Design a protein with these regions (language model features):
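DNA-contacting interfaces and partner/effector-binding or oligomerization modules
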Residues: 1-57
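Short acidic/glycine-enriched loop/turn segments that link adjacent beta-strands
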Residues: 19-20, 124-127
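Short alpha-helical segments that sit at the start of domains
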Residues: 50-76
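Short amphipathic alpha-helical elements of helix-turn-helix/winged-helix folds
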Residues: 75-83
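Short acidic, hydrophobic short linear motifs in intrinsically disordered regions
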Residues: 83-95
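Short amphipathic alpha-helical interaction segments
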Residues: 96-112, 117, 128
Length: 148
């Protein structure tokens, strides 16, 4: 996944590019919309870093999530929450992490009790390992959605 900017400088995550327009997602709100390609330019920021930086303060300050080590890992947690259950191969294909960095971040999130293994039967390849967020992680993200 790439990041792009519109003419006003607002950053988006590029979901899908077509011939004349692209579907983009606002990393703060998760809202998706189409924007003309002529109105977008590439951004050099990592998609996971952008997602992490866009995490609401209320989520960052949640006692259960405070232990996340850095913004990129927080972005990974948000993306897992958005796409769950999601396979490791899908994450490797979608984001700018090498296998070693991804597994390190997943191990950190697992050790903190923020993600757990998930069954991917029928979703991806049979030998792909999957993850989903834990109940306490979902509760932290849901609380901010309900607050506005």
């Amino acid at each position: 996944m790439e990041t792009v900017r519109d003419r006003s400088g607002t950053r988006y995550l590029l979901v899908k590019r077509s011939a004349e327009s692209s579907r983009v997602r606002d990393p703060r709100t998760g809202e998706e919309r189409y924007v003309r390609n002529d109105d977008l330019e590439p951004s050099d920021e990592s998609a996971l870093l952008a997602a992490g930086r866009a995490t609401p303060t209320a989520v960052r300050e949640d006692p259960d999530l405070r232990g996340v080590g850095d913004e990129r890992t927080l972005g990974l947690l948000r993306e897992i929450a958005r796409r769950e259950p999601v396979g490791v191969l899908t994450l490797l294909d979608s984001y700018d992490l090498c296998e070693s960095d991804l597994h390190g971040s997943l191990a950190e999130l697992r050790a903190a009790g923020l993600i757990e293994p998930a069954d991917l039967d029928g979703i991806t390849l049979a030998d792909d390992r999957g993850y989903r967020t834990t109940e306490r992680t979902r509760a932290a993200f849901d609380a901010t959605r309900q607050d506005g």
